[in-house]
Structures are given as structure tokens and as C-alpha cells.
UniProtKB/Swiss-Prot annotation:
Keywords: Antiviral defense, RNA-binding. The keyword RNA-binding applies. GO terms for biological process: defense response to virus. Part of the Csm effector complex that includes Cas10, Csm2, Csm3, Csm4 and Csm5. This is CRISPR system Cms protein Csm4.
């Protein structure tokens, strides 16, 4: 299996669809895929977009945080051995991401939860910026607030992709053409510098393990759903928003709402997922990425 690891050096980002005043740290793979579709159309029209959608073995993780040399993954939605103290429970709740190499110690209850909780602040900080919107025909600007995440200097987001060499080559080409990701890009959010890096062994994806944690906001196909749910522990996230296309309709229209499994969900059986069409009556399909990459949880946690 061919793979490439990309590091996105962001300053400020606005990710998530829960309103302007909130923002998440990570970026779901479907948000990135939408940007890839837009860039493919810009670079090569419908032909290049068709090539991207036809990449049947291309798999993406969500964009997840790194701090220095450490690549962080979502806290698994899995039972954790604990002494049951209220302090341990409070510390565990503060942990959103942890180094992939520490998954085993976290799940078997030997990790330093205080250190892992403190590590969250090394990613960056949430903040709110005051803005003003000026509308035609109005003298006064309407104030509004935008939530964003500011990364520390040695922190950012990483993406792992697997696929054929030609698929990874197309992905790299498109990524290099994108200037910013997420919302409020005209306000300076989401700009990044892109570099490639060597993927550590702790991030090796697999489908061969008793417990598989998805690194991607994803969804099984209808035929896979029942089997995937057996023994799974998961969180559902609503994916929605407006279509970013000037040719889709004469006015901004929303995508079809869909619920997916959040990254960090744990399954005993892998699934393939797919590329969904979430259009609602517009002039062309609107593609939503829902294929997972899985990471094996240590056997002692299975």
C-alpha cells in the first residue's frame, strides 16, 4: 500500500458547521474533499473532477493535530481502565487527542493523564474575533463574531492518504493548488503551508485487528451498515452546510444533511464506505467523502 503524510502549517482556522462562533481543532475529510473537488474543477474542469471521483482506492484521514514530532489521534470511543477516581475522570474528559504511540498506555490505564490533558494546550487556543458586515443600502455595519482556532508555532494538522501512486500524485497536485481550507477564508482564516513528511509506524493503517479506530469522519454503505454496527462504539456527527459552487443554483442552497461516524469511533469489522451525492435539486452532483482509514487499537484494549 502506498501512503503519503502531509503536514498543514496553519495560523488560524475556522472549521465546523455549528455556527460562526464555534470552531473545531480538526478538519473532517469531507471538508477537505469538497475543496479538492473545487480545485479539480478549477485546474482541469469536469475531466479532472471525474478523475478525482474515480480514485477508487484513495483513502484519507481527517486532518488531525500534530505538535512538534508527535502525531495526535482522536481519543478512542472505547472503555478505558481506570481507578475510578473523580480526578481521573475529569482529566480524561479534557483529552481530545493523544499521540498515536500512547494509545496502548491510555487504554490500559497507565498513561499520565495529567500530561496528556496539558498537551491539549500545546496544540493551540480557541478564540473569537469581532467582525462587521456591510450590506447594500445600509449605512451602519452589522457586527458579528467568528470563532476560530489559533495554532501554536510548532503545531498544525496532518493528513495521511493511501492509494495508488497515480491517485496520490493527483491528490498532491490538488493540495498544492489549494490556498486555504474551512470557513471565513476571505477574512484570512485557513491559509496554510504544505509539506510532506515520513509517516511513523504508529500511524500504519490496517483493517486486520480485533478493534479498529477510524481516523476519518466516515459512513458504511447501506449494505455494510448492519455488520459495521455489531460491537461498535461510536459517535454520530451531523454533516451539513451550503454548496460551494456558482453553477449549482442561482442562489446558495444547502447540501443534504447526513450523519456520519466521528473519527475515534471503534469497530470490530472494517467497512469501505463511499463517495456520497448530497445534492438537493441543483444542477450537478455534490460529492461528500465517507471512506475510512482505520488504526488498530492495541490488543490489550480489544
Amino acid at each position: 500500500m502506498n501512503s503519503r503524510l502531509f503536514r498543514f502549517d496553519f495560523d488560524r482556522t475556522h472549521f465546523g458547521d455549528h455556527g460562526l462562533e464555534s470552531s473545531t481543532i480538526s478538519c473532517p475529510a469531507d471538508t477537505l474533499y469538497s475543496a479538492l473537488c473545487v480545485e479539480a474543477l478549477r485546474m482541469g474542469g469536469q475531466q479532472l473532477l471525474g478523475e478525482l471521483v474515480a480514485c477508487s482506492t484513495l483513502r484519507l484521514t481527517d486532518l488531525l493535530p500534530y505538535v512538534g514530532p508527535d502525531y495526535l489521534v482522536p481519543k478512542p470511543l472505547h472503555s478505558v481502565r481506570s481507578d475510578g477516581s473523580s480526578m481521573q475522570k475529569k482529566l480524561a474528559k479534557k483529552i481530545g487527542f493523544l499521540p498515536a504511540a500512547q494509545l496502548g498506555s491510555f487504554l490500559d490505564g497507565t498513561a499520565d493523564l495529567k500530561e496528556l490533558a496539558a498537551r491539549q494546550t500545546k496544540i493551540g487556543v480557541h478564540a473569537v474575533s469581532a467582525k462587521a458586515a456591510i450590506h447594500n443600502g445600509k449605512k451602519d455595519a452589522d457586527p458579528y463574531r467568528v470563532g476560530y482556532f489559533r495554532f501554536e508555532l510548532d503545531a498544525g494538522l496532518w493528513l495521511l492518504a493511501t492509494g495508488s501512486e497515480s491517485e496520490l500524485g493527483l491528490l498532491t497536485r490538488l493540495l498544492k493548488g489549494i490556498s486555504a481550507l474551512g470557513g471565513e477564508r476571505t477574512s484570512g482564516f485557513g491559509a496554510f503551508n504544505l509539506t510532506e513528511s515520513e509517516a511513523p509506524a504508529a500511524l500504519t493503517p490496517t483493517v486486520d485487528a480485533a478493534s479498529l479506530m477510524t481516523l476519518t469522519t466516515s459512513l458504511p454503505t447501506d449494505d455494510e451498515l448492519e455488520a459495521a454496527l455489531a460491537g461498535a462504539t461510536y459517535r454520530l456527527v451531523k454533516r451539513s452546510g451550503f454548496v460551494a459552487s456558482s453553477t449549482y443554483a442561482d442562489m446558495p442552497l444547502r447540501k443534504r444533511d447526513i450523519y456520519k461516524f466521528a473519527a475515534g469511533s471503534v469497530f470490530s469489522r472494517p467497512f469501505q464506505g463511499g463517495i456520497l451525492d448530497v445534492s438537493l435539486g441543483g444542477n450537478h452532483p455534490v460529492y461528500s467523502y465517507a471512506r475510512p482509514l482505520f488504526l488498530a487499537l492495541p490488543e490489550s484494549a480489544a
